[in-house]
Swiss-Prot record:
It comes from Burkholderia mallei (strain ATCC 23344). It comes from the Bacteria. The lineage of its organism: Bacteria, Pseudomonadati, Pseudomonadota, Betaproteobacteria, Burkholderiales. One of its GO terms (cellular component) is extracellular space. One of its GO terms (biological process) is butyrate metabolic process. This is D-(-)-3-hydroxybutyrate oligomer hydrolase. Participates in the degradation of poly-3-hydroxybutyrate (PHB). It works downstream of poly(3-hydroxybutyrate) depolymerase, hydrolyzing D(-)-3-hydroxybutyrate oligomers of various length (3HB-oligomers) into 3HB-monomers. Keywords: Hydrolase, Secreted, Signal. Belongs to the D-(-)-3-hydroxybutyrate oligomer hydrolase family. The active site is at S311 (charge relay system).
Amino acid sequence: MTAIRGGSRRAPGLALALLGGVLLGACHGDENAQVNALPGFVSGSVRKTAYDGASDDLLTAGLGKTGLGSDTRPGFANPAQPSAAELRRLAIYSNYRALVDITPNGGYGRFWGPNVDLAGNDTLGEGKIAGTEYLAYSDDGSGRKNVTLLVQVPASFDPANPCIVTATASGSRGVYGAIAAAGEWGLKRGCAVAYNDKGGGNGAHEIGTGVVTLIDGTLATASSAGSSSLFTASESSSTLAAFNSAFPNRYAYKHAHSQQNPEQDWGRVTLQAVEFAYWALNEQFGPVVDGTRHGIRYRPGDITTIAASVSNGGGSALAAAEQDTRGWITAVVVGEPQINVRMTPGVTVEQGGAPVPSFGRPLADYATLANLLQPCAAAAVAATGAPYLSALPMGVTQSIRTQRCATLAAAGLVSGADTASQASDALAQLYAAGYLADSDLLQAPMWDSQAMPAIAVTYANAYTRSRVTDNLCNFSFATTNPVTGAVAAPAVSPMTNLFGAGNGVPPTNGINLVFNGASGGVDHRLATPDASFAGAFCLRQLWTANQLGIGTNVDAVRVAANLQHKPAIIVHGRSDALVPVNHASRAYVAQNSATEGRASQLSFYEVTNGQHFDAFLSVPGFDTRFVPVHYYDEQALNLMWNHLKSGAPLPPSQVIRTVPRGGVPGAAPALSTANLPPIVQSPGANAIAVNAGVIDVPL
């Protein structure tokens, strides 16, 4: 590993991690300089590491297609103290598998995977990709932002035909979070890939021990790490000690507890990732001047750059394109973007010629509502047969559903004299709030899997700029007894492999979401018979009553849907029950048409039977009913590449009517092209009409 020295800030705890590496000198400077200089936002040293494409590589960390597809995750030589390289390997393994269906029947190794080339053919063997990585922090000088930036430059990069693809992390994942969603396509195309972790990055602080994560996933104490930790809780050591005494075995998380409202910066840090990639490419391919330093070969706008990713990363790409004032971004391709749109009067979302009940709500609104109602709505007749996605016994889950319905009814929040009617009313309220009937069978698994509770709690903390010591709405993050769910000390600290195995939003990697009741902290699902209704209702009230500054902080993350006439593609699954299409993509496209008018170059592809988590597609009931949206994300990237490089027109906005695999849950037939119709130039009756602030999606 080589490291390029930037700013002066460097933690003592990093010294051992840098052994075996070299520090290369570079100064910060302005864009008009003739010498390549690190952007001013880069803090500390840049680590440069070369990978041979055999023992280790950019895409698979040396695991290859076979290793990524194996259910046996890579281990550590010393489980108590894994190396940075081992943590990187586990992070790539975990994040790759978290974004796509990894089963052969589901498409891995046939439609996507390291062995599959950009034409969809199995020609690349194990798919290892040689090249170089550049790793650094972006910071504002406070040492508290510490956004992780990473650039991968494949050995196949052609300096005469340069390209960059952004791969901003989805969810609250670490810097490798979008390696399967966008990084893989970019590397295969021979492009540099610009990653960032959005200032969430799976950074955690173990309150009882003071242990924190560093940029490479290795650990240090908060005091020794100083300002070089991924995240350290802002409270004083005495305050944290008192909190730990009252609430032991708790964890602070960066996205939830940094008090930064990091989402407001997601567009900016994505642009920084691109600028950092420009610097890396100039460093690698620029002419040598004065014998040691490199000159400027590429200036803003010289490199074909596609802002890409999915979910939160997709929203970040859209925000970056809107904020781009220097020509960093050429085009945008995103999947299922989590985006909060600033809607203007007159903008309308229709389906089948009729206005939808609700659209354009921010995540803080729809997530807190869904978290409140989903456990009850899951008992509705329309949700019968939903895939079961919980480790709890079915009897426990059914009891939770019944009790949540009863408590909602007692509070006057749903109507009905029995569970069935109460559940139907809860589901009807979700319809009225903009959820589609296409999502009926996903309401249960979105809550049972704890995806929605995790989102509601983490984002409520972020949008209120809460501290870990606030225990917002009596929720916190803790290790628990696997049988009772009560807070308990872990047998082995989850911090050891957190960088490699965690996803940044508890419950993850043994750190669970707990509700702090009279008897102490317990897994929120088990803390009360109605699964911590009081906490869920409190989260909802934060939004409805505009408490703790939530409205102001949500306004700070809204976007205008002005892509500045850049060519763009949005892909979204119609059945998405985590990021409902009415509130995200449909609303964005409608607002974009009002903002940009006929100058807009945005195409929108809505995928029937597509939902948010392709990694769930191997679960019984998911396999038979839903199709991979990732397949269309890759098709969209190919379409955009052809548009940029050969002038091929982008297909117009359309509904893609897929065919579920069917069969027996857990044993669906192999995915085939019969399930996946192409995106077409002439969609006919499947065309989505977009004009002057109105989008009309065919039924």
